[in-house]
Amino acid sequence: MKKVAVIGTGVIGNGWITRFLANGCEVVAHDPAPGAKERTIQAIENAWESVEQLGLKEGASKDSLTFVDSIEEAVKDADLIQESVPERYELKHGVLKEIDRFAHSNTIIGSSTSGIKPTDLQIGLNHPERLVVAHPFNPVYLLPLVEIVGGEATTKEITNRASVYYESLQMKPMVIEKEIEGFVADRLMEALWREALHLVNDGIATTEEVDKAITYGAGLRWAQMGPFMTFHLAGGNAGMRHMLEQFGPALKLPWTKLEAPELTDELKERVIQGCETHANDRSVEELEKKRNEFLVKLIDLVEDYWP
Amino acid sequence: MKKVAVIGTGVIGNGWITRFLANGCEVVAHDPAPGAKERTIQAIENAWESVEQLGLKEGASKDSLTFVDSIEEAVKDADLIQESVPERYELKHGVLKEIDRFAHSNTIIGSSTSGIKPTDLQIGLNHPERLVVAHPFNPVYLLPLVEIVGGEATTKEITNRASVYYESLQMKPMVIEKEIEGFVADRLMEALWREALHLVNDGIATTEEVDKAITYGAGLRWAQMGPFMTFHLAGGNAGMRHMLEQFGPALKLPWTKLEAPELTDELKERVIQGCETHANDRSVEELEKKRNEFLVKLIDLVEDYWP
């Protein structure tokens, strides 16, 4: 992959451009908004020091960027196309149809959509099979996660190829097999976000207090582990098995506006086995030691950089 | 504050003991379980290197710990009492009544409960006014957050005094004025947790994938900022105002099992004003610069410590 087209240059599109440039790609961008090019150049300028610190690939240059006046011109020779126009179905779908019309038939089109199902985006395309969702996280040039979701027309070969592409951009692709609105990461984030809005709406906490409740608590742990391994470590030596016994009943309590699933034996086993497999023979004590070393450094880091 | 009583020595109680010792307190502990003392000594041993790295207070010593055989003996001369018995109302309430009976009438009792309302815990106490929830986060000896929640009988003077106590333990106390089940931090965590269980239950993602979706994405940002400031920075120069325009409509979409509140003009303004006040005249660009410096270091740190 050498030449990448980026369609739509808002915060996300510009984040992609920076990542592509930092990884030695040649980028052709298109956005019809007045002043788009200048804003993109400024955005790259602001981000460049950070990507340099993380490490540039050979041949990486801020100058390998061209702005063109049409989608056709942007996509016609591209090896990968990244669509990042605003999150409105009609707009996105129209742009994707135009991309599809002018791109090589086997060029992968990645859509940055946060939650629209790829099957819905594939409707009416000439080559729907090469469209995947490739959903990144802000700031795109730093955060490694990208969710790869195929639609009904997408083949396994395409999601695999897409996964390899994005991995070559120093990302952590996560292929999601079952297509649902919001995919995986945004479902988790959106649950937290909606609960946070309820807390503010009900006058329980200010936005600053909600942020404080995360940054000085769970947020520190989630940087290293997600919710499952975090709870595995909170369960003492018996890990998640003990945790579910201890806090399973809380799933029935009004601790959030979100109804929990029934904690069946099957779900319990799935969660416990998942954590134990992930722990991979490392005892809770061993994992705790690693976590503690990490947290000590992270707490120092947070002190230096926030508020 | 010099002498602290800790009642209940599971993962949380032992975390408290370590924090108290690291901050130069003398600790008297009680737990009727066989082998409790040995487990506590081991837990302190495992954690001590980390608290040393974060910095011990003058006079801090692992040896300033005594185990005693009764609640009476533990609490009678204490300046602060921390209750951390298992999360079952009847058990906690019984223990708190016994603590209340033997403690000095003006000694603050902090309950580590994750979600039981302090008003419910105060029922039948001789001096209910000095009972507050002081809810910590695992690992208690490292994570700074502690939620302070008073019940109906609690005076403002007591929550203030409690707040000063916990702050002197190098913690970040957050006083929550409105008493609700789950308080603030656990409501947020529980929303994420329940959504995560739904994803696993519905076969959308494995526990490992859920964890990956957090650790390589939002988790990195949440270590430094909570959900509100994170979105403020994702909104470009117009910050949260733009973000709500862009992603407000997504609140109606099935991106989580949790119903969102109505995004009224009042709620919008509350959220926007909250973020702008917190940003405190720092532009989004300025905050982004700080965030990027932080993320570069954090990403390096995560590489070193996980998996």
Curated annotation (Swiss-Prot), chains A, B:
> Keywords assigned by UniProt?
Cytoplasm, NAD, Oxidoreductase
Q: Name one GO biological process term.
A: carnitine metabolic process
Q: Which GO terms describe its molecular function?
A: carnitine 3-dehydrogenase activity; NAD+ binding
Q: Identify the pathway.
A: Amine and polyamine metabolism; carnitine metabolism
Looking up Gene3D superfamilies in the UniProt record yields:
N-(1-d-carboxylethyl)-l-norvaline Dehydrogenase, domain 2, NAD(P)-binding Rossmann-like Domain
GO cellular component term, pick one? cytoplasm
Catalytic reaction(s) noted: carnitine + NAD(+) = 3-dehydrocarnitine + NADH + H(+)
The positions annotated for binding NAD(+) are 8-13
Q: Where in the cell is it found?
A: Cytoplasm
- What's the Enzyme Commission number for this chain? 1.1.1.108
The record ties this protein, via InterPro entries, to: 3-OHacyl-CoA_DH_NAD-bd, 3HC_DH_C, 6-PGluconate_DH-like_C_sf, 6PGD_dom2, L-carnitine_dehydrogenase, NAD(P)-bd_dom_sf
Q: What is its biological role?
A: Catalyzes the NAD(+)-dependent oxidation of L-carnitine to 3-dehydrocarnitine.
Subunit structure, interactors included? Homodimer.
The record ties this protein, via HAMAP family, to:
L_carnitine_dehydrog
Query: What name is this protein filed under?
Result: L-carnitine dehydrogenase
Q: Which organism does this record belong to? A: Oceanobacillus iheyensis (strain DSM 14371 / CIP 107618 / JCM 11309 / KCTC 3954 / HTE831)
